[in-house]
């Protein structure tokens, strides 16, 4: 069962909780949501790839959704939902950042901090520490 938690920095952001619930469904069974677009990693950054950090293009509330005929790879924008997959529990993910606007430009600058956040507060947590996190399951 896929579980998605939220980093402490975003915990008070209501939208992050909604995205966590939707991300769990998306990763678990491929449920499509109006706000989720193209999905991938930060392939040009070895440290981000090594830390299991990924991104999904994200439409924000109030933005017009992509046309329904667009494929996932056509659903691109300049906002990212950034998350990591745990090293040992491959069904547990954590939302680390929402980068908006100018995600393509800012992500290179923000990645070192996001990598450190993933490494120090999520990707190597023990099973007991993971169990203590509030999660959205699917």
Identify the residue ranges that each predicted region occupies.
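Hydrophobic/aromatic beta-strand elements that line small-molecule binding cavities or substrate pockets
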Residues: 81-82
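Basic, Lys/Arg-enriched alpha-helical interface segments
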Residues: 1-78, 87-138
